[in-house]
Amino acid sequence: MCKVNWMLVEDSDFDCPVPGLPLSRQVFVNDALAAGYALAVRPRSGQSVIQTSSDGLVAGDIHIRGSDKVAVRAYWVQPAGKGPFPTVLVVQEIFGVHEYIRDTCRRLARQGYQAIAPNLFQRHGDPMGMPTVQELMSDIVAEVADAQVLSDLDACAAWAAANGGDPGRLGLTGFCWGGRIAWLYAAYNPRLKAAVAWYGRLKGSSSPMTPHHPVDLARALQAPVLGLYGGKDPSIPVEDVEAMRGGLAEAGKRAEIVVYPEAGHAFHADYRPSFRAVDASNGWGRMLEWFRANGL
């Protein structure tokens, strides 16, 4: 059963063509800008305001071989001591695996999880090196295929199971771009116990790179998903949330969608002006509850 709390918000239209882009990529960039990335503040380093100590944790940068034999870089952290630990895959925003994402992994490790954040854009460039969000979207994000992302996440899950993670307790959380991936992975991997999607896009145009969106996959979900959204996020209109809720309810899927009335997009991102401490803290608590209620 799906539950949702929401309030009406006004949608915003963006028309930001990128000269010279092939149509499929142009559609993707327009969709992405309309999904709130145009409002994103490009971080200098993604330096998290919240600084989580690594005392009592083991952490480091690792490489995980993908299905195409590319060694994908990832940040890994878990409690010191003997496992196996439940694993949470952490899926980045469009800005990559910067310090905020790493700190989020450490926060999870302090709760007893093994956390892994793979660099899912690695094959296409460094997000932090792009001069504008628009160029980041067209030159990197538009080149990333959902199929490759899902395959890379599978590789991370396999690595985790062989390196201190409990193969029977796998979860995932994602932010912004990664929030959409959270819904997709819950429809893709039957071994996933639970997922939490933070303000992930629910609708979009179909393309070879992104053939399906969460609203298309409500019936296909194989794991319970918690969606956390901002009531003042101009990028994800209430109609999209309602459509997702309706699809989940019709399919009889176990899911919950929470909308924070005064929050905008990226309300958990503590390095950005959009950060809302109270809502972020509440969402974090709900996420941990969701994981534990579903065997993680």
Question: Model-predicted segments: where are they?
Answer:
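Short beta-strand/loop motif that positions the catalytic acidic residue
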Residues: 221, 227-229
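C-terminal catalytic histidine-bearing segment of alpha/beta-hydrolase fold enzymes
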Residues: 249-296
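Short amphipathic alpha-helix adjacent to the substrate-entry channel of hydrolases
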Residues: 99-123
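Primarily recognizes the serine-hydrolase "nucleophile elbow" in alpha/beta-hydrolase
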Residues: 154-220
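Short beta-strand element of the alpha/beta-hydrolase
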Residues: 84-93
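N-terminal cap/lid segment of alpha/beta-hydrolase-fold proteins
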Residues: 47-81
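N-terminal secretory signal peptides
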Residues: 1-23
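Alpha/beta-hydrolase active-site loop
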Residues: 136-163
